[in-house]
A protein has these predicted regions:
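N-terminal signal-anchor/first transmembrane alpha helix
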Residues: 1-37, 113, 191
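Transmembrane-helix boundary motif in ABC transporter permease subunits
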Residues: 31-34, 80-115, 127
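Generic hydrophobic transmembrane alpha-helix motif, especially the helices
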Residues: 56, 60, 101-162
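Membrane-cytosol interface at the C-terminal ends of specific transmembrane alpha-helices
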Residues: 85, 93, 97, 134-185, ...
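Hydrophobic alpha-helical transmembrane segments of polytopic membrane proteins
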Residues: 126-127, 131, 200, 215, ...
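Non-cytoplasmic
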Residues: 127, 132, 136, 140-141, ...
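Short cytosolic juxtamembrane segments of multi-pass membrane proteins
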Residues: 261-282
């Protein structure tokens, strides 16, 4: 683990990613116990105030402190990103296991199902889920997790199929190892470089999706702090006070870029093809 982190830190993009992601985690933890102002602390007479010592990032249309809402929103967005990655990984790996199954019927059926479902937009999935469940973070997580899981399965299939047909997998199966054990000990490790990149991209894309879905009214619920909520409530007043849109937009952009760079750096750190130290160790 220490070697992986040092390899990531050695890259310029990796430094940026670790610093930004580390700051995100710290702010999320800090917001559990402290924010400059209560989220319910509003003052209509102080709406759209410019940045000042009292309000470093200014206030929004209700007079609420923008920094406090962004700090509290970081916690919501962290939850969405982490849970989306978990859901996408579970769905993606289950589908990959079916797609490389030694049962030809199961494998071919899984490929057809993935190809058919992957064409459904994330927004449509969210709209369908919002009908019975309403707008919530759970809808964002479920919609993004399903959509990204399907995409993950299709991307991982070639490398997983190559590993499944290798001699060492055949030997493991002939020696009596179960298909589940072979999948997780021999096939999944061969997909790790691609898996890491795709999951980090899924985390970043989920933040963009949350902002878009919240703007459409099917994202996080009203009154729930999130970066998408801060954007959606202030974008209509961009001509009045552009700074209210600038801050959440800047935060989302910085974190999404950091997650993508982290995925690239992590792939380079754990892939023997790009890390000479791993080739020498092998």
């Amino acid at each position: 683990m220490k070697t992986v982190l040092s390899t990531i830190w050695a890259k310029a993009g990796g430094k940026y990613a670790l610093i930004v992601i580390g700051a995100w985690l710290l702010v999320s933890a800090l917001s559990l116990v402290w924010t400059p102002y209560s989220l319910l602390d509003t003052n209509g007479f102080n709406a759209w105030a410019s940045p000042s010592a009292a309000h470093p990032l200014g206030t929004d249309g209700t007079g609420a402190d923008v920094l406090s809402w962004l700090m509290a929103g970081s916690r919501t967005n962290l939850m969405i990103a982490v849970l989306t990655v978990i859901v996408a990984a579970v769905i993606g790996l289950l589908l990959v296991a079916a797609m490389v199954s030694r049962s030809g019927a199961l494998a071919s059926t899984s490929v057809v199902v993935v190809d058919a479902l992957i064409s459904i937009p994330t927004v449509l999935i969210a709209l369908i889920l919002s009908v019975p469940f309403g707008a919530s973070a759970a809808v964002v997580i479920a919609a993004c997790g399903c959509a990204y899981g399907l995409n993950l399965a299709r991307i991982l299939r070639p490398s997983a199929l190559l590993a499944a047909r290798s001699a060492y997998v055949e030997s493991a199966l002939w020696s009596g190892a179960s298909s589940v054990r072979v999948f997780f000990t021999h096939i999944v490790p061969n997909t790790l470089p691609v898996l890491c990149v795709q999951l980090s991209m899924s985390a970043g894309t989920s933040l963009l999706a949350e902002a878009g879905l919240t703007y459409l009214g099917v994202g996080v619920g009203a009154g729930v702090p999130s970066w998408g909520h801060s954007l959606s409530t202030s974008v209509k007043f961009i001509s009045v006070y552009p700074m209210a849109v600038l801050w959440p937009g800047l935060v989302v952009t910085m974190v999404v870029v950091a997650l993508n760079l982290f995925g690239d750096a992590l792939r380079d750190a754990i892939d023997p093809l790009t890390n000479p130290a791993l080739r020498e160790a092998a």
